[in-house]
């Protein structure tokens, strides 16, 4: 199965990178801990057990973390990666996943992938926790998206 040539849409890529960051286990744990800390400090501030400064610091920490993971990190990654500005074509078959660029191509065995995830506009194919491909769903025509999903389910064990 072969996709059309595709280009990345900046807004959709940034949204996909947000999904990537928020789906990481360590970031989920950090978000939960900071939210618990913020709720605890708000409660203690309400009952006048802590000073306003402690409450402001916990609120500031929460805002910084949300701005970092929701706005800054996705944009930084997008700007640093030149591949989001190129055109690609993929080919899926029983043995390999092939990525074709206008100047070169590369094939990967399915066993090289660690896991995969689906977000609203992309399939995320992971080599490890930090290295992955974003494959736009709109690169496939008609039933191609479902075919690709079936390949990923069959070939990449989550």
Regions found by a protein language model. Give the residues of each.
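Hydrophobic alpha-helical transmembrane segments
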Residues: 49-62
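N-terminal membrane-targeting/pre-transmembrane regions
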Residues: 1-40
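Phosphoinositide-dependent membrane-docking surfaces
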Residues: 97, 106-123
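A membrane-cytosol interface segment of integral membrane proteins
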Residues: 124-158
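Alpha-helical transmembrane spans of integral membrane proteins, capturing the lipid-embedded, hydrophobic core
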Residues: 34-38, 59-63, 67
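Conserved beta-hairpin
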Residues: 67-107
């Amino acid at each position: 199965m072969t996709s059309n040539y595709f280009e990345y849409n900046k807004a959709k890529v940034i949204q996909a990178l947000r999904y990537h960051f928020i789906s990481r286990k360590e970031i989920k744990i950090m978000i939960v801990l900071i939210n618990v800390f913020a709720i605890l400090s708000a409660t203690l501030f309400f009952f006048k057990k802590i000073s306003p400064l402690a409450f402001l610091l916990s609120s500031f920490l929460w805002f910084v973390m949300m701005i970092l993971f929701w706005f800054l990190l996705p944009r930084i990654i997008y700007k640093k990666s030149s591949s989001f500005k190129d055109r690609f074509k993929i080919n899926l078959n029983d043995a390999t996943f092939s990525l074709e660029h206008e100047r070169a191509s590369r094939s990967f065995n399915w066993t090289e992938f660690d896991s995969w995830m689906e977000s609203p506009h992309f399939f995320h194919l992971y080599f490890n926790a930090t290295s992955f491909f974003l494959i736009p769903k709109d690169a496939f025509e008609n039933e191609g998206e479902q075919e690709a999903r079936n390949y990923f389910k069959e070939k990449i064990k989550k």
